[in-house]
Amino acid sequence: MAETVWSTDTGEAVYRSRDPVRNLRLRVHLQRITSSNFLHYQPAAELGKDLIDLATFRPQPTASGHRPEEDEEEEIVIGWQEKLFSQFEVDLYQNETACQSPLDYQYRQEILKLENSGGKKNRRIFTYTDSDRYTNLEEHCQRMTTAASEVPSFLVERMANVRRRRQDRRGMEGGILKSRIVTWEPSEEFVRNNHVINTPLQTMHIMADLGPYKKLGYKKYEHVLCTLKVDSNGVITVKPDFTGLKGPYRIETEGEKQELWKYTIDNVSPHAQPEEEERERRVFKDLYGRHKEYLSSLVGTDFEMTVPGALRLFVNGEVVSAQGYEYDNLYVHFFVELPTAHWSSPAFQQLSGVTQTCTTKSLAMDKVAHFSYPFTFEAFFLHEDESSDALPEWPVLYCEVLSLDFWQRYRVEGYGAVVLPATPGSHTLTVSTWRPVELGTVAELRRFFIGGSLELEDLSYVRIPGSFKGERLSRFGLRTETTGTVTFRLHCLQQSRAFMESSSLQKRMRSVLDRLEGFSQQSSIHNVLEAFRRARRRMQEARESLPQDLVSPSGTLVS
């Protein structure tokens, strides 16, 4: 006989099912390994030989009417949350004084019915359901040392049996929440109790009583064969995994007489009928088809293209954070300025925004306010003027950082500006800010006590104002001081017909502006050729209207 291959992987496996968990069925086979077990396989392996059947040498039935082999091997099919009583529970609940809870009395009634109907169907294999007061200490008790002889203390065992439960309570519609959604000053106990998401679980343990023959019903001989956990999302956790094609699991008992047991766990849940599977397949196909049609109706069938020579700029941005400012409770006012030449935006487009007020948090040596405020906008660039050799201007993002205190006093903390990236992709930009200041102590006292300070009338003065027409801009006499920084995260998308042109014989242009300039050159050449055709057509019409005697008959005039 070949050597038995044991399965040593006792880790848990996770499954997901959309079917009701009540349909779950497991077949558990338990057998004690003895020398006679191996001999019983010999006749089947050597059929056709003149051998004596080993059944002759098997032990005879005992006085109780059961052979020892039947007690050493058991196979049973168990359903989800099906209660199978152990011999210890049968002996315990037969005594009415041991019953303390309604569940104990219910178990007592069930055990009495089983005794009247001929006894329970299981011998060594039994279960602990989600309602039972049982906790696997090996799973919940964390060892403090690496010693194999470490035993959990009495307090650890009692605390492991305290099971956390969370009822799925759904509030009434329109009801008022009694608890606060945000706790501004959490205590250490609050953080310790709420930092873990506690998902409601239903647990079931499949156990085995591996005590000696006719000495069942002792807690010290109980061993966990399999643990099943199911949550409300249909996630099923099995530890250890189903046997399948792997070898059986093994258990070695401790004590004076060590014994070796093997067991297998198989999923024998009933399969759906072909008609039910086909009906479910049609339902899901119809559902997915309707969802696909809904998404298609949102997207549309026509892909929106830009006009030739135009660039569409789409920006998904985020005001990430601000740090390094004097006062707390910050908020940011920002807007995008489009250059007057070549740039435009839809009429409904909003190019400005204001973040929420955010309290700063100490991070290293700085106080940081995390906004995570999203914004989006789009703009169009149309390159038409070829006479100008200057590079086209790009949109500019301006920001103004302000603080607001408890008395509704606001202060300007800084101004800043940054040019939007000219390349598509994700960009993280840090904008340094400054603010105008006044000399003297009175200005600082006014800023501290009543708020308010010098402000810019035009925020575009941070760079070059749009109303400026000269060659040089002087800021002489403006006193400023450097303040903090604002971090932006921008995801830029660019769309243009120029991106559709690709040729292996031509080198890739350096930027989209080069491609747009090529479109303008092609348009200029097209305009010249069209003007030449119109002039030639007018010349031919003029010749046809001339008298014939003015035209040379000898053909000297050749068009």
Swiss-Prot record:
UniProt keyword list: Bardet-Biedl syndrome, Cell projection, Ciliopathy, Cilium, Cilium biogenesis/degradation, Cytoplasm, Cytoskeleton, Disease variant, Intellectual disability, Joubert syndrome, Meckel syndrome, Obesity
GO-annotated cellular components: centriole; centrosome; ciliary basal body; cytoplasm; cytosol; membrane; MKS complex; nucleolus
Protein localization: Cytoplasm, Cytoskeleton, Cilium basal body; Cytoplasm, Cytoskeleton, Microtubule organizing center, Centrosome
Biological process terms in GO annotation: branching morphogenesis of an epithelial tube; cardiac septum morphogenesis; cilium assembly; common bile duct development; determination of left/right symmetry; embryonic brain development; embryonic digit morphogenesis; embryonic skeletal system development
Highest taxon of the lineage: Eukaryota
Pfam family, one: B9-C2
Domain C2 B9-type span(s) in chain numbering: 311-439
Assembly notes: Part of the tectonic-like complex (also named B9 complex). Interacts with TMEM107. Interacts with TCTN3, AHI1, TCTN1, TCTN2, CC2D2A. Interacts with FLNA. Interacts with TMEM67. Interacts with B9D1 and B9D2.
Job description of the protein: Component of the tectonic-like complex, a complex localized at the transition zone of primary cilia and acting as a barrier that prevents diffusion of transmembrane proteins between the cilia and plasma membranes. Involved in centrosome migration to the apical cell surface during early ciliogenesis. Required for ciliary structure and function, including a role in regulating length and appropriate number through modulating centrosome duplication. Required for cell branching morphology.
PANTHER family: B9 DOMAIN-CONTAINING (PTHR12968), TECTONIC-LIKE COMPLEX MEMBER MKS1 (PTHR12968:SF4)
Disease per UniProt entry: Meckel syndrome 1: A disorder characterized by a combination of renal cysts and variably associated features including developmental anomalies of the central nervous system (typically encephalocele), hepatic ductal dysplasia and cysts, and polydactyly.
Protein name: Tectonic-like complex member MKS1
Organism: Homo sapiens
Gene: MKS1
